[in-house]
Amino acid sequence: MNKELLQERKKMIYDFICDELYVPMKAKEMAIVLNVPKSQRAELMEVLDALTADGKVEISGRGKYVKSEGKYLTGVFTAHPRGFGFVTVEGEEEDIFIPAAQTNGALHKDTVQITLSKNSSGKRKEGTVTKILSRGTEQLVCTYEKSKTFGFAVPDNPRFAQDIFIPLERSKGAVSGHKVVVEITDYGKNGKKPEGKVVEIIGHINDPGTDIMSIVKGYDLPVEFSQKIMKQVENVSNEVSAADMAGRMDLRDWQTVTIDGEDAKDLDDAITLTKEGDLYELGVHIADVSNYVQESSALDVEALKRGTSVYLVDRVIPMLPHKLSNGICSLNAGENRLALSCIMKIDEKGNVIDHTIAETVIKVDRRMSYTSVKKILEEHDVAEIEEYKELVPMFERMKELAAILRKKRMKRGSIDFDFPETKIILNEQGKPVDIKPYDRNVATKIIEDFMLIANETVAQDYFWQELPFVYRTHDNPDTEKIKKLGTFINNFGYTIHIGQDEIHPKELQKLLMKIDGTPEEALISRLTLRSMKQAKYTTVSTGHFGLATNYYCHFTSPIRRYPDLQIHRIIKDNLRGRMNQKRIEHYDSILPEVAKHSSEMERRADEAERETDKLKKVEYMEERIGQVFEGVISGVQEWGFYVELPNTVEGLVHVTSLTDDFYHYEESSYEMIGERTNKHYKLGQKVKVIVADTDKIMRTIDFRVVRDDVEPDEAVKDEASVLSKMTD
């Protein structure tokens, strides 16, 4: 039974049991009452078992099914490195807090049964794990340590706080310092450590590439494509055939460019722009990947499984094989390419007054980089202008239209967080040699604005056609978090209006505009971001809070995102007149799982990308232990505060390193306060720090505060003295 059918039948049986006329009965009696054929009674048991596991239904002492009195809840346990955890329960707005003493052997990602604590009437519910229903992790990436008679493995993921005991005969010859994949054979209980066996040796921790591969393995990212898939890809032509172009709009004589980063190889969007009178005609042309990835083929199944390309600091793990992503699907200059185009007529106020979505064939004139376009439009570089003189008028129009679109978006309340992304420069050996923020400039904003309007236009079109679709949605923030934010910003003289327990995005946008350039900007921006929910993929268009729009989707990146590829199939079925009732039912049945899985794979990719960035930042700062930097306090917790440097590196100043006073954490104002000196360390405050230590295994950086009255050279000496005492 597939997931959709199981959910449907669970609802039906649960409604039946909840009916006021229901009399408790056994499974066999229920089958008779509901006229379930004998051939389908196993399916009824599957549904009843699922409802029991969910805690919605209980079995009485006489073996009869009754509605649960709410004694038990079922969910997935998320562990915290400090021992406590949270359980996510379907239907509950907030996760349930599990104190460290009440986890009862539950490990990260386990599915557990819990009871709510009697004192769980506060703002956050608390519970106790009463039963582990299923284990969520079978294998872990660890660092192996060997002793004379046994070995043990230290998990890379700090959420798994316990070491794993490895009998020597199950170590596969691993030595101390090896990165290994460990399969858990015994999860341990009553204080006994988990036990496991080494199933793969990735390499020694000091070997080049082992660090990144450990993260790849840890997140179970698929690296290689199967022979079956590669054989399928071999049969794909390197050129667009006449048959492929037949019946498409031919736009090859339109002046067309791609604008991407210098290193990009998977070019999936191209732009055309003309202006007649008061109307702009913007063409956003997206690689027609669905022409080469047939639905339900081995290649399609693998693409769905991956969900997205993963951009790690030293490599790309693509959703599609390179022959497609960098070859026939990539909109390379001078080559005929198949596209799905959204061509929009836009007035001078930024309104899309007409649009066409069509299958097209295009030929890109020039492959532009963000740097080149920036030089032309911002720096007026003579050499660049001469090199691309035939395109300069179009670039000027692009700048003009992007500003109009952005102004319209901002007017309706779209929120723009301008946090710098990190660019880590590696040498040939994979060592980080520089870390700097990505340059967000006029060229990157042009592409951003054009992709946004195309995604919005396509989503609105298909919403009103009432066809099955995958939308990109962003729910309104949690009311309690917004109220907490409102209380905090009052300390700085700012207010936000919350109407009927909801906030309009324009309120947050106005707040960000007010704090622009102020000392508290970083502080309030971060807290505002933390108050918001994650965007996700859904089959219902509930709107996008952050963009302040009712309709949004991801249409523009089918080479690297599966939802975009899925949308392209739906659009092409519709354009070709194939969207009959059978196809509608087909999409209705598969899209909920596509949306859910794609959201999960996006989060996995984001986490893996963050971890590789953290790893290389630690490696970079390892060479700078003892150096002094100025940074900004970016987070405050009871165990210390985090400081972010201008190059985006973040480290922890542990509360125990603040030796000039005893500091306590004031949660309401996000600050550390010295009890004797009344000295404050708060979010957004500038501080000088010295790099005290780094840990590549835990991927952490430790800072110590440099007092204002101490010269940098003296601070280094003081730090050396402290470190020597710690290691003596």
Predicted region positions:
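Intrinsically disordered, low-complexity mixed-charge segments
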Residues: 1-7, 11-14, 23-24, 707-728
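A short macromolecule-binding patch
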Residues: 94-99, 160-166, 649-665, 713-718
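Electropositive polyanion-binding surfaces
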Residues: 32, 181, 186-188, 212-217, ...
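Charge-lined substrate channels and their catalytic hotspots, especially those that engage the 3′ end
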Residues: 1-283, 290-336, 374-375, 671-672, ...
